């Protein structure tokens, strides 16, 4: 990874409040920690205001759907606050991951997602300015846009580390197929990568679980807007509104698909490495025993990213998530048909 890209990602993640103290100097860590504390104070203030302010007793159906959308927006801020808080306490563990997974050559995968992140930032800025021009609301939309951008950047933060892990697995695979006979060193290197993968799962597991739950929240917003436009007719069916709705749900789906695909590549390379070992011809019984022991180690300790012990990140998980969303949409449409009648 080029130096400018590494510095850009470092600054971007610090600006979003996702990391603490990437800098090696004490002053850099102090400034980063102070910035995180300021973000936490602001977010906690917004959350407290949301739960303590008195809302008017408006029992109309449009008001109910508007409150649901506001609730999902607040969920983004709450998760952003939790990520910033965990960044303060998990600073050393994150630095350990960065040391164990140093920058590698930047791939097209990272550049594509960097471009996507820039596009999301531009769309966020455009929507904030549009809302200010139309309704005169600026600060509240800016706060929500900041939390939305930061929470979605959590996917990119993990994808960078998964891409580095993928590069390490690729190097190990090349050493095996090139004829390296030092199986003891190869086994130690693989065990180290498996340990790093577990650390990666522990650090990002809960975040990924919450972000995947937020994906369902994004679909709730889409369904509520659809209901308010198609049946209650309290919102105009404009192209701008359609663009806002797509901006809510599409980037999240793209990021979930990307992180699942990146994790699936690591799992596939681990299985391919095991198959390559089985196909290697053993010159002596001792060498054959070492090869079989290495293959058994890979089978017993596979490279896979665990999400809070509930599921593993791979393309099968992605398919299950999409089927769950489709079932939820079917239930919603049935509910809409009942309300309409």
Swiss-Prot record:
UniProt xrefs under Pfam families: 7tm_7
GO BP, sorted A to Z: chemosensory behavior; detection of chemical stimulus involved in sensory perception of taste; male courtship behavior; monoatomic ion transmembrane transport; signal transduction
Extracellular side: 23-30, 90-113, 224-233, 340-341
GO cellular component: axon; dendrite; membrane; neuronal cell body; plasma membrane
Tissue expression profile of the protein: Expressed in neurons of the terminal external chemosensory organ of larvae.
Family the UniProt entry places it in: Belongs to the insect chemoreceptor superfamily. Gustatory receptor (GR) family. Gr2a subfamily.
The name this protein goes by in its record: Putative gustatory receptor 9a
């Amino acid at each position: 990874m080029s130096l400018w890209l590494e510095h850009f990602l470092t600054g971007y993640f610090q600006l979003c409040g996702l990391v603490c103290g990437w800098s090696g100097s004490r002053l850099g860590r102090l400034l980063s920690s102070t910035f995180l504390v300021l973000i936490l104070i602001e977010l906690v203030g917004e959350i407290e205001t949301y739960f303590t302010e008195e809302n008017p007793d408006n029992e109309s159906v449009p008001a109910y759907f508007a409150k649901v959308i506001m609730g999902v927006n607040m969920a983004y801020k709450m998760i952003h606050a939790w990520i910033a808080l965990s960044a303060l306490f998990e600073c050393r563990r994150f630095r350990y991951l960065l040391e164990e997974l140093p920058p590698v050559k930047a791939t097209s995968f990272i550049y594509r997602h960097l471009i996507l992140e820039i596009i999301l930032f531009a769309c966020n800025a455009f929507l904030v300015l549009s809302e200010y021009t139309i309704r005169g609301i600026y600060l509240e939309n800016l706060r929500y846009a900041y939390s939305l951008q930061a929470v979605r950047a959590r996917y990119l933060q993990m994808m960078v580390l998964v891409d580095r892990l993928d590069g390490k697995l690729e190097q190990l695979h090349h050493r095996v197929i090139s004829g390296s006979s030092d199986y003891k060193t190869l086994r130690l290197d693989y065990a180290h990568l498996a340990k790093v993968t577990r650390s990666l799962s522990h650090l990002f597991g809960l975040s990924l679980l919450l972000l995947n739950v937020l994906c369902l929240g994004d679909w709730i917003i889409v369904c509520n807007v659809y209901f308010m436009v198609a049946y209650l007719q309290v919102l105009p069916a404009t192209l701008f509104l359609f663009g806002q709705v797509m901006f809510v749900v599409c980037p999240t789906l793209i990021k979930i698909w990307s992180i699942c695909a990146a994790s699936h590549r690591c799992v596939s390379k681990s299985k391919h490495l095991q198959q390559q070992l089985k196909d290697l011809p053993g010159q002596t019984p001792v060498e054959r025993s070492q090869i079989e022991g290495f293959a058994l180690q890979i089978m017993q300790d596979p490279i896979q990213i665990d999400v809070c012990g509930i599921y593993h990140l791979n393309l099968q998980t992605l398919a299950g998530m999409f089927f769950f969303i489709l079932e939820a949409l079917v239930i919603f449409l049935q509910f809409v048909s009942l309300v309409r009648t």
